[in-house]
């Protein structure tokens, strides 16, 4: 008979003693259980002790968290959090440097536990740590090592959100900023200092201003030229935080300062083109910087043109002048009147491809793209003048019905690029899809526009398009761009080459190929064959999903991006009856053994799988921290008794794998986008294999007719 659900069997360790095997009744008070354990080892004063996990982060067990204890867990009897906090408080202020160093090491480790952190903070522990840092006394021995542990403990304690970051003093900020600005500082101190400054900026608007005054652009950029990718990552993270929290009127100034210090080229040469693979966190920070840089365009994108603003109208005049040469300006001709000049302007604006020939300023009153489109056109006209003139004159000399309207095309293309690059949207926590080519040029967006407007003109000619085909051409151009971007070209020239290979005929071929599975096999016999094969394919997909769950996946812990990443791992037992999971010190490179995963959930106990906003950990997050990308990757397992295991998948692929696998375990349909894609691919492949012998044979829409009965059956011979 299985034990009651309130009873869990555990092993409890104590240094120098044999472990106790104990059945814990979860209905009993924790203090009573601790007393029983202490009595087993004849330890007095049981109120001085508590239980904590022996493995992983070694978290303390409280009345609130005791329900997480599972059968087979190994626990430790340990000094209670309040007593440990008191002892460490005394030891961190010891006159003996060895004692103080050991205390700081232990404090840095225990501070990750919220139970201990609460006790230590209640004893004004954070104030003690900040004073130690503010004193800046370079002790004769162990100074760097002790300071590193002090900063680690401080960061761990603050990360729990128990006290506000606003409590830190100017002296503390100056001291931390000093470690960042020093030319020769210990790597571990520099890393923690950068992380602390980033957390301050992200968590307090008032601290942002103080830190912005202390940290210079040059100081941060110098840390990008080192060989340590972790330091580079923290430096870019701080740059991103300062960028993100800067008032709108200051962001452009920051961007200009970064440009003067050649931030982009330093990142390109020392990070992206360095001799090291880009780690996940670095890729995320590069993605964030890319998004924030493009977001500087948002103001122009959302600014309408004022038709009465002469300076803005002069830009349109400049576009006309560059295209058609100042010498042909009618105002230079003797005796030219106002009406004649207006007629000439109208003709030129029509040749430039504006929708409103009389007053082209009206074309820029829609947002997006607003004035950003005009900025792009002027950049092309001035920086790539030959290209601009060629496109305009080439189209103005065509037959009317086949001319590609440059003005209208440029406006719509700018809007399209803003949509594709999501200009104006905040960075997503779970994404790391930066594009190296955007770090190869200070005016990457304008250069991208220049490449794509040439692509549009080329595609227009290949399609032999007319004005009525404008939207069709734009759809093809969008497809060409979105097919080229995922290849992540290293330079704009490589991107241009990729677009050249995606000609209109190639797009048609790709579309045709992708339609094969949908359009080629629609006759009733083929449909019937598909329906017969489909269950086999679904079973194959199901087995693949379950096999992937058996291999397991690594998941990043929520809320730890600003510090060293923490991970946990989950995998399905080979008999498909239990989910094993547990914390990890590092992101694993290979398979994690079942033995190293201490926690488990019986599949029979799983009640439901919820996703997105229905997940408990998404409801807990504030609206400011939520974003669409994280919601799309979130899912939770609800299991008895009223417990949850919360996930945020590293990417959409892993999300689909786990949702499908868990659904299959519960006997539900696999409904992810990946299943639909895999089903279509495998069905199409299987159908083609089975129909190889029928190549060039017309398959009828209906079965052949049944012939009439013969007039007699005299041809039948009966053997005697």
Swiss-Prot record:
PROSITE patterns: ELMO. The modification Phosphotyrosine is found at residues 48, 717. Residues 311-485 form the ELMO domain. It is linked to Vascular malformation, primary intraosseous: An autosomal recessive, rare malformation characterized by non-neoplastic severe expansions of blood vessels, usually seen in the vertebral column and in the skull. The most commonly affected bones in the skull are the mandible and the maxilla, and life-threatening bleeding after a simple tooth extraction is frequently observed. It is found in: Cytoplasm; Cytoplasm, Cytosol; Membrane. GO terms for biological process: actin filament organization; apoptotic process; cell chemotaxis; cell motility; phagocytosis. Disulfide bonds: none annotated. It comes from Homo sapiens. The gene is ELMO2. A motif (SH3-binding) lies at residues 700-707. Residues 553-674 form the PH domain. This is Engulfment and cell motility protein 2. The keyword Translocase does not apply. Widely expressed, with a higher expression in skeletal muscle, kidney and placenta. It comes from the Eukaryota. One of its GO terms (cellular component) is cytosol. Involved in cytoskeletal rearrangements required for phagocytosis of apoptotic cells and cell motility. Acts in association with DOCK1 and CRK. Was initially proposed to be required in complex with DOCK1 to activate Rac Rho small GTPases. May enhance the guanine nucleotide exchange factor (GEF) activity of DOCK1. Interacts with the SH3-domain of DOCK1 via its SH3-binding site. Probably part of a complex with DOCK1 and RAC1. Probably part of a complex with DOCK1 and CRK isoform CRK-II. Interacts with ARHGEF16, DOCK4 and EPHA2; mediates activation of RAC1 by EPHA2. Interacts with ADGRB3. Interacts with AUTS2; the interaction is direct.
């Amino acid at each position: 008979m299985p034990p009651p659900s309130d009873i869990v069997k555990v092993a409890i360790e104590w240094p120098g003693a044999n472990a106790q095997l104990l059945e814990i009744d979860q209905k009993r008070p924790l203090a009573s259980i601790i007393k029983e354990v202490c009595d087993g080892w004849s330890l007095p004063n049981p109120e001085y002790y508590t239980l904590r996990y022996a493995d992983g982060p070694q978290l303390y067990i409280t009345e609130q968290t005791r329900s997480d204890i599972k059968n087979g867990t190994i626990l430790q009897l340990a000094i209670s959090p309040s007593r440990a906090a008191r002892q460490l408080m005394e030891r961190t202020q010891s006159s003996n440097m060895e004692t103080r160093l050991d205390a700081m090491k232990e404090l840095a480790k225990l501070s990750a536990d919220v139970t201990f952190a609460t006790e230590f903070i209640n004893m004004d522990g954070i104030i003690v740590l900040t004073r130690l840092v503010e004193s800046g006394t370079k002790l004769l021995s162990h100074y760097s090592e002790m300071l590193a542990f002090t900063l680690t403990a401080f960061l761990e304690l603050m990360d729990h959100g128990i006290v506000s970051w606003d409590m830190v003093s100017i002296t503390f900020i100056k001291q931390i900023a000093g470690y960042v600005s020093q030319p020769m500082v210990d790597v571990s101190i520099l890393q923690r200092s950068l992380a602390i400054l980033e957390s301050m900026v992200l968590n307090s608007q008032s601290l942002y201003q103080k830190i912005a005054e202390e940290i210079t652009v040059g100081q941060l950029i110098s840390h990008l030229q080192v060989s340590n990718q972790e330091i580079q990552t923290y430096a870019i993270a701080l740059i991103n935080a300062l960028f993100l929290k800067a008032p709108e009127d200051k962001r452009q100034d920051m961007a200009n300062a970064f440009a003067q210090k050649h931030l982009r080229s330093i990142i390109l040469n020392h990070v992206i083109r360095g001799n090291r693979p880009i780690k996940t966190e670095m890729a995320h920070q590069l993605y964030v910087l890319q998004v924030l840089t493009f977001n500087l365009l948002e103001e122009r994108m959302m600014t309408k043109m004022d038709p009465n603003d002469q300076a803005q109208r002069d830009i349109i005049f400049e576009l006309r002048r560059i295209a058609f040469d100042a010498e042909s300006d009618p105002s230079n001709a003797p005796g030219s009147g106002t009406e004649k000049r207006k007629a000439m302007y109208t003709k030129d604006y029509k040749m430039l491809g504006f929708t409103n020939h009389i007053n082209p300023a009206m074309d820029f009153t829609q947002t997006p793209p607003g004035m950003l489109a005009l900025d792009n056109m002027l950049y092309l006209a001035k920086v790539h003048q030959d290209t601009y003139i060629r496109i305009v004159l080439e189209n103005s000399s065509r037959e009317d019905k086949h001319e590609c309207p440059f003005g209208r095309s440029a406006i719509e293309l700018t809007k399209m690029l803003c949509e594709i690059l999501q200009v104006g949207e905040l960075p997503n926590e779970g994404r790391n899809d930066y594009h190296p080519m955007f770090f190869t040029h200070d005016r990457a967006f304008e250069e991208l526009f220049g490449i794509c407007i040439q692509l549009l003109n080329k595609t227009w000619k290949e399609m032999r398009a007319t004005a009525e085909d404008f939207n069709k051409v734009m759809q093809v151009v969008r497809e060409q761009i979105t097919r080229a971007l995922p290849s992540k070209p290293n330079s704009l020239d490589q991107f241009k080459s990729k677009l050249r290979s995606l000609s209109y005929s190639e797009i048609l071929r790709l579309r045709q190929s992708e339609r094969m599975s949908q359009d080629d096999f629609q006759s009733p016999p083929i449909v019937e064959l598909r329906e017969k094969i489909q269950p086999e394919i679904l079973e194959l997909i199901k087995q693949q999903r379950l096999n992937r769950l058996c291999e397991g996946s690594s998941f990043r812990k929520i809320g730890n991006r600003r510090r060293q990443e923490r991970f946990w791992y989950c995998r399905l037992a080979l008999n498909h009856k239990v989910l094993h999971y547990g914390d990890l010190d590092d992101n694993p490179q290979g398979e994690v053994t079942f033995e190293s995963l201490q926690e488990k959930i019986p599949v029979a106990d799983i009640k439901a799988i919820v996703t997105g906003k229905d997940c408990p950990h998404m409801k807990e997050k504030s609206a400011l921290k939520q974003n669409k990308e994280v919601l799309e990757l979130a899912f939770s397992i609800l299991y008895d008794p009223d417990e949850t295991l919360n996930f945020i998948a590293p990417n959409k692929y892993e999300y689909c794998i786990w949702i499908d696998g868990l659904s299959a375990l519960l006997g539900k349909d696999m409904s992810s986008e990946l299943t639909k894609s895999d089903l279509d691919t495998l069905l199409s492949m299987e159908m083609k294999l089975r129909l190889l012998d029928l190549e060039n044979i017309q398959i009828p829409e209906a079965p052949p007719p049944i012939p009439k009965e013969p007039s007699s059956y005299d041809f039948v011979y009966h053997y005697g």
